[in-house]
Amino acid sequence: MYSLSSVSKHLILVHILALVATQLLLIRSVSSLNMTNSYLNHKCFVSQGKYKPGSAHEKSLEAIIHSISVGENVNSGYDMMSFGDGPDLVCVVLQCRGDSYGSKCRSCFASAMAGLRRRCPRYKGGIIWFDQCLLEISSIDNVGQLNYGDSFCMSNAKNVGDDPFSFILKWDTLFDNISRIAITEKNKNLKDTNKPALYGAGEKRLGTKKKMYGMVQCTDDLSVKACEECLVANILKFQNCWKSGKRGARVLDRSCNFRYELYPFVNAKTGPNSYFKS
């Protein structure tokens, strides 16, 4: 016979196990998206020189850092500020990934700023890439201009295996569609603009079990035409990096980036526009 006490303890244990199982499922769900914010790369703009401690340039930079940190523009995933003039001009551009805005964007800005200042100490210019944002500091105002000089590619060492030709055809289908979304569909999170989001994401079946996931994005200071030009140029420029059928690759620069993997890495529900599925 079971006592009332033992039954009660058993029910409590079951409840605790259920809570643990729920938490594990939530952790698994988040990790399955691979929503990391890893450091990817950086470049110091050595030619722009360094600033001195306590200089007008440093004060301008500190003022911008504070304004972006406490401002509301990060809620949309993008911010651009400039301060000063001549040799003391400071321009800062922050672009967060389309599904990373608000607190995630603010957190990525803090990580990127700390990382750039550590890797490029007192340089007037530099750029750094994380999974969920890019940050550029410069003494030259190049906002709205295409920049291919800082582009690079990172690819998976492994190939997809059989039939890379079929893989590339499906890659083309996926990226044609998400690029179209990026340059035609407005940002649903912004009510006061009709400008397209310059971000697109989606997935394409590779068979009965596998899927390919892709994402394209341009910085918000670009025009639609410039965004399209940037994506096409980088896809062609780095085709040897991914067109052999790599299991994943990404191309990044100051103006635009794209990525694909065989696992989900963006949040389809928090993107600024529709999510492509095929």
Curated annotation (Swiss-Prot):
Location within or outside the cell: Secreted
One Pfam family per UniProt: Stress-antifung
Residue ranges of every copy of the Gnk2-homologous domain listed in the record: 39-142, 148-265
Secretion signal span: 1-32
Disulfide partners: none
PANTHER family for the chain: CYSTEINE-RICH REPEAT SECRETORY PROTEIN 18-RELATED (PTHR32411:SF53), CYSTEINE-RICH REPEAT SECRETORY PROTEIN 38-RELATED (PTHR32411)
Protein name: Putative cysteine-rich repeat secretory protein 17
Organism name: Arabidopsis thaliana
Highest classification ranks of the organism: Eukaryota, Viridiplantae, Streptophyta, Embryophyta, Tracheophyta
Recorded name of the encoding gene: CRRSP17
